[in-house]
Amino acid sequence: MLMDLDLQGRRVLVTAGTKGIGKAVVRLLKQQGATVLTTARHEPAESTADAFVAADLTTIQGCNLVVDAVQKHLGGVDIIIHVAGGSTAPGGGFAALGEEEWQQELNLNLLPAVRLDRALLPGMLAQQDGVIIHVTSIQRELPLPESTTGYAAAKAALSAYSKSLS
């Protein structure tokens, strides 16, 4: 059963909204009447979003591109849904992760949310309305130590950060 969210006129940013969970989120939001801007590193052949920006969210510059696109295409934002995440770290647990792998995990799974929230939340506070959703992982509580230590730690940090915004 699909609930009626009545998102008519709501402006939404969905990170990583071109495939998988993100694409499904964009589709649902559009069905509920929202105006949606989404991101990915590369523009897809087709998108259900109203606007798209190609940006590498693991970088400050990529996050800044998204903030600029939100202002240009949406004039601000009412809802932010952070779907971006994943891991390319090697298996082998803690011992297999060097400084570079740890930084990559944080750059993908934690810092984009912090950077985008920091830039867009003041506008939501000014309009006294808004919602931020951070998609994390069960691994924030139940990590797979032999394969996803950095990912799990970054998602746990994202969950703690999210609670701090409440």
Task: Locate each region found by the language model.
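Active-site helix of classical SDR
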Residues: 117, 154, 162
